[in-house]
Amino acid sequence: MGALEPNAGAPNADGLAALLVFPKALIDVLPVLPVLVPNWGIPNAEVVVPPVIVFAVPKLGLPNALPPMLLVLAALFVKGLIPLVLERLGLAPDVNGLPKADITVESLLGSKFNDSLMSFCVKVQQFSVIVL
Protein backbone atom coordinates (compact mmCIF):
# COMPACT_ATOMS: atom_id res chain seq x y z
CA MET A 1 0.00 0.00 0.00
CA GLY A 2 1.13 3.60 -0.55
CA ALA A 3 2.89 5.65 2.05
CA LEU A 4 0.70 7.34 4.65
CA GLU A 5 1.43 11.00 5.28
CA PRO A 6 -0.33 13.53 7.54
CA ASN A 7 -0.70 16.19 4.85
CA ALA A 8 -2.73 15.98 1.67
CA GLY A 9 -2.33 17.38 -1.79
CA ALA A 10 1.40 17.00 -2.51
CA PRO A 11 1.84 16.63 -6.29
CA ASN A 12 3.94 13.91 -7.84
CA ALA A 13 7.31 14.69 -9.40
CA ASP A 14 6.07 15.52 -12.89
CA GLY A 15 3.57 18.09 -11.61
CA LEU A 16 0.69 16.29 -13.34
CA ALA A 17 -0.89 14.69 -10.30
CA ALA A 18 -4.51 13.66 -10.52
CA LEU A 19 -6.21 14.32 -7.20
CA LEU A 20 -9.12 12.22 -5.99
CA VAL A 21 -11.11 12.08 -2.81
CA PHE A 22 -13.12 9.28 -1.28
CA PRO A 23 -13.74 7.62 2.09
CA LYS A 24 -10.90 5.77 3.76
CA ALA A 25 -12.95 2.55 3.85
CA LEU A 26 -11.95 1.84 0.23
CA ILE A 27 -8.24 2.57 0.57
CA ASP A 28 -7.53 -1.16 0.97
CA VAL A 29 -8.92 -1.78 -2.53
CA LEU A 30 -6.58 0.67 -4.25
CA PRO A 31 -3.34 -1.29 -4.57
CA VAL A 32 -4.98 -3.67 -7.06
CA LEU A 33 -6.24 -0.94 -9.40
CA PRO A 34 -3.11 -0.56 -11.56
CA VAL A 35 -3.31 -4.31 -12.18
CA LEU A 36 -7.04 -4.28 -12.94
CA VAL A 37 -6.81 -1.42 -15.45
CA PRO A 38 -4.13 -2.50 -17.95
CA ASN A 39 -6.01 -1.72 -21.17
CA TRP A 40 -9.27 0.20 -20.94
CA GLY A 41 -8.73 2.33 -24.00
CA ILE A 42 -5.52 3.71 -22.51
CA PRO A 43 -2.44 2.62 -24.48
CA ASN A 44 0.37 1.49 -22.18
CA ALA A 45 -1.74 2.21 -19.10
CA GLU A 46 0.36 -0.18 -17.09
CA VAL A 47 3.28 2.19 -17.66
CA VAL A 48 1.57 5.56 -17.20
CA VAL A 49 -0.47 4.59 -14.14
CA PRO A 50 1.96 4.65 -11.19
CA PRO A 51 1.38 3.03 -7.80
CA VAL A 52 -1.20 4.79 -5.70
CA ILE A 53 0.13 7.03 -2.92
CA VAL A 54 -2.29 7.68 -0.07
CA PHE A 55 -2.30 10.94 1.90
CA ALA A 56 -4.65 10.40 4.85
CA VAL A 57 -6.70 13.27 6.23
CA PRO A 58 -7.77 12.27 9.75
CA LYS A 59 -11.22 13.87 9.86
CA LEU A 60 -14.82 12.72 9.87
CA GLY A 61 -16.06 11.54 6.50
CA LEU A 62 -19.07 12.77 4.56
CA PRO A 63 -21.30 10.75 2.21
CA ASN A 64 -20.05 10.35 -1.35
CA ALA A 65 -21.54 12.31 -4.21
CA LEU A 66 -20.20 9.75 -6.71
CA PRO A 67 -19.26 6.09 -6.33
CA PRO A 68 -15.59 6.10 -5.30
CA MET A 69 -14.52 3.51 -7.86
CA LEU A 70 -15.89 5.70 -10.67
CA LEU A 71 -13.75 8.56 -9.40
CA VAL A 72 -10.68 6.33 -9.31
CA LEU A 73 -11.27 5.02 -12.82
CA ALA A 74 -11.84 8.56 -14.10
CA ALA A 75 -8.51 9.66 -12.65
CA LEU A 76 -6.71 6.67 -14.14
CA PHE A 77 -8.25 7.53 -17.51
CA VAL A 78 -7.12 11.16 -17.28
CA LYS A 79 -3.67 10.08 -16.11
CA GLY A 80 -3.43 7.83 -19.16
CA LEU A 81 -4.55 10.61 -21.50
CA ILE A 82 -1.95 13.13 -20.34
CA PRO A 83 0.99 11.46 -22.15
CA LEU A 84 -1.14 11.15 -25.31
CA VAL A 85 -2.03 14.86 -25.21
CA LEU A 86 1.62 15.80 -24.68
CA GLU A 87 2.63 13.62 -27.63
CA ARG A 88 0.04 15.28 -29.89
CA LEU A 89 1.34 18.70 -28.80
CA GLY A 90 4.89 17.65 -29.57
CA LEU A 91 5.81 17.92 -25.90
CA ALA A 92 6.28 14.24 -25.09
CA PRO A 93 9.30 13.48 -22.88
CA ASP A 94 12.53 12.53 -24.65
CA VAL A 95 14.20 9.13 -24.29
CA ASN A 96 15.67 10.12 -20.92
CA GLY A 97 12.20 10.89 -19.55
CA LEU A 98 12.89 14.62 -19.36
CA PRO A 99 10.08 16.94 -20.49
CA LYS A 100 10.74 19.10 -23.55
CA ALA A 101 8.97 22.04 -21.94
CA ASP A 102 7.82 23.22 -18.54
CA ILE A 103 4.50 21.37 -18.42
CA THR A 104 2.03 21.66 -15.56
CA VAL A 105 -1.68 21.06 -15.06
CA GLU A 106 -2.10 24.83 -15.16
CA SER A 107 -0.30 25.20 -18.50
CA LEU A 108 -2.33 22.37 -20.03
CA LEU A 109 -5.78 23.21 -18.68
CA GLY A 110 -5.56 26.86 -17.67
CA SER A 111 -5.37 28.57 -14.30
CA LYS A 112 -9.15 28.48 -13.77
CA PHE A 113 -9.10 24.67 -13.71
CA ASN A 114 -6.16 24.65 -11.31
CA ASP A 115 -7.89 27.12 -8.97
CA SER A 116 -11.08 25.04 -9.06
CA LEU A 117 -9.15 21.88 -8.29
CA MET A 118 -7.43 23.47 -5.31
CA SER A 119 -10.64 24.94 -3.90
CA PHE A 120 -12.36 21.56 -4.41
CA CYS A 121 -9.59 19.81 -2.46
CA VAL A 122 -9.88 22.34 0.36
CA LYS A 123 -13.66 21.81 0.56
CA VAL A 124 -13.35 18.04 0.84
CA GLN A 125 -10.74 17.79 3.57
CA GLN A 126 -13.09 15.42 5.40
CA PHE A 127 -11.99 12.74 2.94
CA SER A 128 -8.72 11.06 2.20
CA VAL A 129 -6.95 12.60 -0.78
CA ILE A 130 -5.43 10.19 -3.26
CA VAL A 131 -2.59 11.25 -5.53
CA LEU A 132 -2.16 9.03 -8.56
Swiss-Prot record:
Membrane topology designation: Single-pass membrane protein
GO CC annotation: membrane
Localisation per UniProt entry: Membrane
Organism (species): Saccharomyces cerevisiae (strain ATCC 204508 / S288c)
Chief location: membrane
Name under which the protein is recorded: Putative uncharacterized protein YDR193W
Leftover remarks: Partially overlaps NUP42.
Membrane spanning residue stretches: 66-86
Keywords: Membrane, Transmembrane, Transmembrane helix
